[in-house]
Structure formats: structure tokens, C-alpha cells
């Protein structure tokens, strides 16, 4: 097949304007190959700007690129290797190896742009995926085949919580895909080594587009990871775990690309196509009758603003929302999850059972009432409260402390062994705190324990 070539006629940042013969004009989203002194890279056609010119976003480096450079129209979108050959590997946005090993020898490659599953093919059955993390399993349980978001500002523990979820859920078996979107290089390398040490790397694919790379890379690497997960679901009929860290960086990269194209932004400087871009991405993360994709996504909150447009655009697509709060982290309680702001569609007696549901509702009531009483305590002190309110405050503080937990992935930093808490032990512990069994115990006794069995 003859490959059509074009010539770069202008370069503005990562935006390339390319001239082709009128009959050879590439389609929108098709990949164009170009070379610099650093290597061979791809660009993606985003706009037809004239009868024989296109605008493309570089998915790679542009240093050393000059006008007059020849580009090759590949005739299809970016395609990445999928299947067994990429299991246990660390890849970049093109699906090329970045783990120092030979390139994956894939028999099959899939384009990163795909249609979402048809409505008639979707699987609507619901099953709870237990994580062993108390606050998540109690307040915002995760649905198998659902989408879960971890929301929080900088430094409140999103990535650590994500790594603990990867550790706990991956140990149960199955295939996993971790996609690092615009995150730190050391986090990706650290995760890769932890997966290797724990013995689950052989069933995991790590895809990285780091924060030092171009906005085109950060915008498309999420689709690379998703495509690998879709192949496992559709062709190998497997249940897949898809971890994405961080969805905000995916949105931010789209905003940068939009600005480079000269498009007018909306509130907060985001791209006008924000809702559509997030929707197109999230709609592909679905469970079908063949297999499921269970997605856990970190979402950074700029300035801790839960109403930021990037967070709002993501909320409506999620089944479970886990909100991490700085004020809880400041108390030294980790994971710093706010049970009052976190919720899950799975917290329903039909899914979790009547006992679990009622205990979760009681916990939320006690913590909400404690929040209301906190203002009185701050001004007048505990002495002004009724005896019932004093008991409620002490129980609320015990519950708050009890929902802390030592993690396996942070053992080497804290010196405390991680704990996986079984559901029955969790519910029994909450029942005992709420019914006053431990009213004579200190609140500090409940910090970083597993269950009531660990009370001495």
C-alpha cells in the first residue's frame, strides 16, 4: 500500500500545520509519522484547515523539528499492541516498551479510538468488590464493573490509597491495567517494582505518560491503557481492573491542546469540549456480557475545590465517589476519607444487605451530628453538652479513629504492618462502638487497628 506524505509548513509549540496533495488529505484522528534527531514520533490530525492542509498535535517531542520536514500519513489512528504480549510490561503511549526489555511481539494491534459498547450488550448485574479497606467497604463500597473516583487535593493520600487498592484487589487474581496520566516518573517506577515484588506483575500492564511529556502524550495515554483493557474484556472475555492516575491530568492535557489550537476556553480555563471528552472516555469503560472493566480513577482537586469543572464533569459518570479531605489528613488519620462527602450507588440494602446498610446510615448520622456539635464544643467546650450528646461525641471520635488503617504499601515508611479487614469483623466492630460496648475505652485505642479483635 502506497503511503502518502506531506510537508510541515509551520510549527507553533506542539501544533503542526502540514501540507498534502489535495487527494491525499488524511482523515481526522489519523496518525502522521515524523522524525527528529531524537527519534521517530507520531502526530494526530485534529483539524482540516484548508483544501490541502491539516493541523496536527504532536504526540511526542518537537525539539529539532523544522519546516520542510516530511511526514507520513499512516492511514489509521494510533494503534497499540494488545493481548498476552503486553502483560507484565511497562509501555508508553505508542505501546512501545519503556521497561528495558525487548518490544512486545503482538500479533494484534488495536486503534486507540473505539466505539463504546452497544446498550444491548451491557451487563447490568451488580456485585460488590471488597477491598479490605474499612472506610471504603463500609461507606462507599465498590461495584464490580463499576467506576470509582478518588477525589482530593495535593498531598492528601490519593496515590497511596490507589496503590493499596491495586495491592489488595490484584491479590485476588485477574488482569489489571494501570495507566499513569501526567504523573511523576518515580511513582510509575515505584508501582512497577511493587507489582514485581508482590508477584502480580505478570497479570498487569503498566502504561505511562509522564508529566514531563507533551500534552498530546498525556491526552492520549489514557486511551492506550483503556484500549488494552477493552481487548481483555471483549476478545479474551475477562474481568479487568483499570486504574487511572490521574484523570485531572487527562483533562488538563486536553485543555492545553485546546489552547494551542486557539479555541476559546470556558470557566476555569478548561476546553469548551470538556463534557464531551470526559463522556466519550468514560462511556467506553463499561461491563458487557463478555467481561467487565472495573475502573478506579484518581481525580486531583485544584485548591481542594470539589466544585472545580474537572471534578463536576467526572462525577456523573461514577458509581462510587471517595473524597479525601485535608482536615482529616491534618489529624494524622489515614486514609483521609470524609465519610460524609463520599457515597456509593452500591450502598443499598439490595446489594450490601440490611445490616450493613443500617450500620452505614448510623455511622453517617453520628458523624454528621458530631460535625454540628463541633461548633458548640469549639466555643463553649464539652461541659455545655447533654449527657447523650457527650456520649455521641466520644463514639463519633472512636469511629473516626477506627476508620484509619495501616496500609501494606506504606509498611516501609510507617513500620506498621498492613491489615486487610474482613467484612464481618468490620461490621461487628462498628456495632460494638455504636451500642456503647467501648464507651470506657480511650479514643486513641482505635487508631490504626484492624477490628475489635486488635483491642488489648
Swiss-Prot record:
Annotated residues for binding of ATP: 152-159
Protein EC: 7.1.2.2
Keyword set, alphabetical order: ATP synthesis, ATP-binding, Cell membrane, CF(1), Hydrogen ion transport, Ion transport, Membrane, Nucleotide-binding, Translocase, Transport
Broadest EC class assigned to this enzyme: translocase
Membrane topology: Peripheral membrane protein
InterPro entries reported in the protein's UniProt record: AAA+_ATPase, ATP-synt_VA_C, ATP_synth_F1_bsu, ATPase_a/bsu_AS, ATPase_alpha/beta_chains, ATPase_F1/V1/A1_a/bsu_N, ATPase_F1/V1/A1_a/bsu_N_sf, ATPase_F1/V1/A1_a/bsu_nucl-bd
Domain of life: Bacteria
Listed GO MF terms: ATP binding; ATP hydrolysis activity; proton-transporting ATP synthase activity, rotational mechanism
Major localisation: membrane
Pfam family, one: ATP-synt_ab
Catalytic activity: ATP + H2O + 4 H(+)(in) = ADP + phosphate + 5 H(+)(out)
Localization per record: Cell membrane
SMART domains to which the protein is assigned, alphabetical: AAA
GO cellular component entries: plasma membrane; proton-transporting ATP synthase complex
Subunit text: F-type ATPases have 2 components, CF(1) - the catalytic core - and CF(0) - the membrane proton channel. CF(1) has five subunits: alpha(3), beta(3), gamma(1), delta(1), epsilon(1). CF(0) has three main subunits: a(1), b(2) and c(9-12). The alpha and beta chains form an alternating ring which encloses part of the gamma chain. CF(1) is attached to CF(0) by a central stalk formed by the gamma and epsilon chains, while a peripheral stalk is formed by the delta and b chains.
Family the entry assigns: Belongs to the ATPase alpha/beta chains family.
Known function: Produces ATP from ADP in the presence of a proton gradient across the membrane. The catalytic sites are hosted primarily by the beta subunits.
UniProt protein name: ATP synthase subunit beta 1
Source species: Listeria welshimeri serovar 6b (strain ATCC 35897 / DSM 20650 / CCUG 15529 / CIP 8149 / NCTC 11857 / SLCC 5334 / V8)
